């Protein structure tokens, strides 16, 4: 169990580090976000949920469509697949040359998020939003600019 929790913690740290790569200073309010992957522990097993386009990278993953919108300190996550909506709030906890960090609360659960440009091996960049919340590591990418 400790090994799985360690792996989940490492994944969360890696997601935050990845999101801090690249240039630009995107903010959570600048985009409409789409979920790429979610990782969490069930029992002693690390479980992935993923967007349909990620199914080849995570063939064991349950396919889920989820979006996130943030504006004026309010955050809404819509789970299109399961017809659920989660609401909460966010505040800026810090800014750096690469992006912005946030404290977030969704449905009474507190966590952390960071928005920055991620640079990939081919040189392409995209705004990314990793979130760590109540044992879940969620990874969103910018679907469209507002």
Question: Language-model features: where?
Answer:
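Sec-dependent N-terminal signal peptides of Gram-positive bacterial secreted proteins and lipoproteins
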Residues: 2-23
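Hydrophobic/aromatic beta-strand elements that line small-molecule binding cavities or substrate pockets
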Residues: 65-68, 88-92, 112-121, 140-142
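Short, solvent-exposed coil/turn segments at beta-strand boundaries
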Residues: 28, 67-75, 117-129, 145-146
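N-terminal helix-cap/turn-to-beta initiation motif at the start of protein domains
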Residues: 21-37, 43
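N-terminal glycine/threonine-rich, aromatic-flanked beta-hairpin/loop signature
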Residues: 45-97
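An anionic, turn-rich surface loop/hairpin at beta-sheet edges
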Residues: 51-58, 94-120
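Glycine-centered tight beta-turn/hairpin loop motif at sheet-sheet or coil-to-beta transitions
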Residues: 81-83, 107-112, 133-137
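Edge beta-strand at a domain terminus
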Residues: 85-96, 130-146
